[in-house]
Structure formats: C-alpha cells, structure tokens
Amino acid sequence: GGVRLSANSDRVARFEADLSGMPDVALPVIVACCLSDTPFHLTGLDTLYIKECDRVMAVTREAGKLGYGLQIPARGELCWDRVRNACTTLEIDTYQDHRMAMAFAPAGVRYCGLIVRDADVVSKSFPGFWEQYDHLVM
C-alpha cells in the first residue's frame, strides 16, 4: 500500500479519499490541497481525534489562521470547498505533534515569514526533517 504522487497538467475538480487505512497522511494531504487550491472531502479520519493531539481540531484551526475555511461535516470527515478568509497570523501551532509541524512546513513556501512554533517536535519521528526541508526549498 501507499500513494504515488506525480505531476501532470490534469487538475482534480475535487479530491475525495477514504483515509481510514492510512490516517497519518491526512495532515499533509489537507495542507497540500489547500495550498494547491484543490477542494477536498476526506473520510476515515476517526483515529485523528486520539493522536498526539486532536488533529481534526488542530488542522482546522491552524489552516484557518492562513485563511482556509475547513469544515467538519460529520465525525471522521473533513472538507474544504475553497472557502477563503483573511489570513490572521503566520504563526502555526503544532500542539506538540510532530505531524502537524511537518504537514505545515510546505506552507512556508507560499507564506513568506511563516513560523512553525515548537518546530523541534519533529525529532520524535524525523530528527533531520528541517535539514532535509532546507535542501528541498533552497
């Protein structure tokens, strides 16, 4: 199992996926969809409420800071229909969750000056994350 990503000119009108078999990819998928202006509807997110933090609440709140109006239509679901609001701050809280920090890192390319607070939390699973990230974006 897994996901293969590739670049092409085809644009998805709306990304829909059941992530119950791979819930840990939800956060980067959500942020990637927002950054690429791709509406989405994700299901199978039931376990995200009981991770290092309530990831559904956390990603909804932090994406909201950047102006993305995510919606929770039902427990275990999250969607975004391209609702945009004003960006209120460029400081992203991680809630001491390594996956929150890593998921929002690419937003720094779009939002100059983005600050990921408690960024060292990535050491839980990927101590060299920020060094690798710097190699990718430099």
Q: Model-derived features: where do they sit?
A:
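Short helix-capping/linker segments at secondary-structure and domain boundaries
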Residues: 35-42, 109-119
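C-terminal structural cap/anchor segments
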Residues: 21-80
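Self-splicing inteins and homing endonuclease
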Residues: 1-21, 66-96, 110-111, 134-138
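Structural signal for terminal/edge beta-strands and the immediately following C-terminal loop/tail
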Residues: 113-138
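Short, recurring structural edge motifs at helix starts
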Residues: 16-20, 45-48, 90-93, 115-123
